Amino acid sequence: VFSALKDWLNDGNSARSFACDEDDAAIIATAELLSLKPIIYAANLDEDGFADCHSNAYYKIVEELAAREGAQVIPVCAKLEAEIAELDGDEKKMFLDDLGIAQSGLDRLIQASYALLGLISFLTSGEDECRAWTIKKGTKAPQAAGKIHTDFERGFIRAEVVNFDDLMAC
Protein backbone atom coordinates (compact mmCIF):
# COMPACT_ATOMS: atom_id res chain seq x y z
CA VAL A 1 0.00 0.00 0.00
CA PHE A 2 2.88 2.41 0.75
CA SER A 3 4.33 1.78 -2.70
CA ALA A 4 1.06 2.79 -4.35
CA LEU A 5 0.80 5.79 -2.03
CA LYS A 6 4.34 6.85 -2.91
CA ASP A 7 3.48 6.79 -6.62
CA TRP A 8 0.32 8.79 -5.88
CA LEU A 9 2.27 11.41 -3.93
CA ASN A 10 5.02 11.60 -6.57
CA ASP A 11 2.32 12.47 -9.12
CA GLY A 12 1.60 15.62 -7.09
CA ASN A 13 -1.47 14.37 -5.23
CA SER A 14 -2.13 14.59 -1.51
CA ALA A 15 -2.49 11.59 0.76
CA ARG A 16 -5.99 12.89 1.66
CA SER A 17 -7.23 12.08 -1.82
CA PHE A 18 -5.65 8.60 -2.03
CA ALA A 19 -8.41 6.02 -2.56
CA CYS A 20 -8.08 2.89 -0.41
CA ASP A 21 -10.09 0.64 1.87
CA GLU A 22 -10.42 1.15 5.64
CA ASP A 23 -7.68 -1.34 6.50
CA ASP A 24 -5.16 0.36 4.21
CA ALA A 25 -6.27 3.78 5.48
CA ALA A 26 -5.51 2.66 9.05
CA ILE A 27 -2.04 1.50 7.97
CA ILE A 28 -1.37 4.76 6.11
CA ALA A 29 -2.54 6.78 9.13
CA THR A 30 0.35 5.36 11.16
CA ALA A 31 2.75 7.31 8.89
CA GLU A 32 1.21 10.58 10.18
CA LEU A 33 1.68 12.31 6.84
CA LEU A 34 1.04 16.04 6.82
CA SER A 35 -1.00 15.74 3.62
CA LEU A 36 -3.40 13.38 5.45
CA LYS A 37 -4.49 16.18 7.76
CA PRO A 38 -7.87 17.78 7.06
CA ILE A 39 -7.66 21.07 5.22
CA ILE A 40 -9.66 24.22 4.60
CA TYR A 41 -8.65 26.68 1.91
CA ALA A 42 -9.01 30.39 2.70
CA ALA A 43 -9.15 32.36 -0.55
CA ASN A 44 -8.12 35.99 -0.02
CA LEU A 45 -9.99 38.13 -2.54
CA ASP A 46 -9.97 41.85 -3.19
CA GLU A 47 -12.97 43.97 -2.25
CA ASP A 48 -14.34 44.03 -5.80
CA GLY A 49 -14.08 40.27 -6.33
CA PHE A 50 -15.34 39.36 -2.88
CA ALA A 51 -19.04 39.94 -3.57
CA ASP A 52 -19.05 37.63 -6.60
CA CYS A 53 -16.18 35.29 -5.79
CA HIS A 54 -17.44 32.53 -8.12
CA SER A 55 -16.65 34.70 -11.14
CA ASN A 56 -13.03 35.15 -10.00
CA ALA A 57 -10.73 32.92 -12.08
CA TYR A 58 -8.27 32.35 -9.22
CA TYR A 59 -11.07 31.47 -6.82
CA LYS A 60 -12.36 28.91 -9.33
CA ILE A 61 -8.91 27.27 -9.40
CA VAL A 62 -8.88 27.00 -5.60
CA GLU A 63 -12.46 25.65 -5.66
CA GLU A 64 -11.48 22.96 -8.18
CA LEU A 65 -8.47 21.95 -6.08
CA ALA A 66 -10.60 21.80 -2.94
CA ALA A 67 -13.29 19.77 -4.71
CA ARG A 68 -10.69 17.17 -5.78
CA GLU A 69 -9.62 16.84 -2.16
CA GLY A 70 -13.09 17.01 -0.64
CA ALA A 71 -12.12 20.24 1.11
CA GLN A 72 -13.95 23.48 1.74
CA VAL A 73 -13.07 26.96 0.47
CA ILE A 74 -13.81 30.01 2.61
CA PRO A 75 -13.68 33.31 0.70
CA VAL A 76 -12.24 36.17 2.74
CA CYS A 77 -11.09 39.69 2.05
CA ALA A 78 -8.22 40.63 4.37
CA LYS A 79 -8.83 44.35 3.86
CA LEU A 80 -12.49 44.03 4.86
CA GLU A 81 -11.55 41.76 7.78
CA ALA A 82 -9.18 44.45 9.07
CA GLU A 83 -11.98 47.01 8.88
CA ILE A 84 -14.45 44.65 10.58
CA ALA A 85 -11.99 44.01 13.43
CA GLU A 86 -12.03 47.73 14.27
CA LEU A 87 -15.83 47.86 14.69
CA ASP A 88 -17.97 47.21 17.76
CA GLY A 89 -20.98 44.87 17.72
CA ASP A 90 -23.66 47.17 16.27
CA GLU A 91 -21.31 48.84 13.77
CA LYS A 92 -20.05 45.42 12.70
CA LYS A 93 -23.59 44.18 12.08
CA MET A 94 -24.44 47.28 10.01
CA PHE A 95 -21.21 46.97 8.01
CA LEU A 96 -21.86 43.29 7.26
CA ASP A 97 -25.47 44.07 6.30
CA ASP A 98 -24.23 46.75 3.89
CA LEU A 99 -21.92 44.15 2.33
CA GLY A 100 -24.79 41.68 2.09
CA ILE A 101 -23.10 39.02 4.23
CA ALA A 102 -24.19 37.50 7.53
CA GLN A 103 -20.75 36.73 8.99
CA SER A 104 -17.20 37.92 8.60
CA GLY A 105 -14.78 35.67 6.75
CA LEU A 106 -12.91 35.10 10.00
CA ASP A 107 -16.08 33.91 11.75
CA ARG A 108 -16.85 31.55 8.84
CA LEU A 109 -13.28 30.25 8.90
CA ILE A 110 -13.45 29.59 12.65
CA GLN A 111 -16.80 27.79 12.35
CA ALA A 112 -15.56 25.68 9.44
CA SER A 113 -12.39 24.81 11.39
CA TYR A 114 -14.38 23.74 14.43
CA ALA A 115 -16.68 21.61 12.25
CA LEU A 116 -13.77 20.02 10.37
CA LEU A 117 -12.01 19.12 13.62
CA GLY A 118 -15.23 17.96 15.33
CA LEU A 119 -15.07 20.62 18.03
CA ILE A 120 -17.65 22.73 19.85
CA SER A 121 -17.46 25.37 22.56
CA PHE A 122 -19.37 25.64 25.78
CA LEU A 123 -19.56 28.67 28.04
CA THR A 124 -19.29 28.99 31.78
CA SER A 125 -20.35 32.09 33.60
CA GLY A 126 -19.86 33.34 37.12
CA GLU A 127 -19.87 36.66 38.90
CA ASP A 128 -16.32 37.50 37.85
CA GLU A 129 -16.01 36.08 34.35
CA CYS A 130 -17.52 34.34 31.37
CA ARG A 131 -15.30 31.82 29.63
CA ALA A 132 -15.44 29.59 26.53
CA TRP A 133 -14.11 26.02 26.62
CA THR A 134 -13.39 23.90 23.55
CA ILE A 135 -14.33 20.21 23.58
CA LYS A 136 -14.87 17.42 21.06
CA LYS A 137 -18.41 17.28 19.68
CA GLY A 138 -20.37 14.57 21.47
CA THR A 139 -18.51 14.98 24.77
CA LYS A 140 -20.85 14.28 27.68
CA ALA A 141 -21.45 16.97 30.31
CA PRO A 142 -19.37 15.30 33.07
CA GLN A 143 -16.33 15.05 30.78
CA ALA A 144 -16.87 18.64 29.64
CA ALA A 145 -16.88 19.68 33.30
CA GLY A 146 -13.59 17.82 33.65
CA LYS A 147 -12.07 20.24 31.12
CA ILE A 148 -12.54 22.96 33.71
CA HIS A 149 -11.21 20.92 36.63
CA THR A 150 -10.91 17.17 37.27
CA ASP A 151 -12.77 17.59 40.57
CA PHE A 152 -15.79 18.86 38.62
CA GLU A 153 -15.91 15.66 36.60
CA ARG A 154 -15.62 13.43 39.68
CA GLY A 155 -18.28 15.33 41.61
CA PHE A 156 -20.55 16.13 38.65
CA ILE A 157 -24.22 16.53 39.59
CA ARG A 158 -25.96 18.31 36.70
CA ALA A 159 -25.59 20.83 33.89
CA GLU A 160 -27.86 23.75 33.12
CA VAL A 161 -27.88 23.97 29.34
CA VAL A 162 -28.99 27.00 27.32
CA ASN A 163 -28.81 27.22 23.53
CA PHE A 164 -26.37 29.93 22.41
CA ASP A 165 -28.95 31.67 20.21
CA ASP A 166 -31.40 31.74 23.13
CA LEU A 167 -28.68 33.17 25.36
CA MET A 168 -27.89 35.90 22.83
CA ALA A 169 -31.59 36.77 22.54
CA CYS A 170 -31.74 37.65 26.28
Region roles according to the model:
Residues 1-170:
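C-terminal-of-GTPase-core extension/linker across diverse P-loop GTPases
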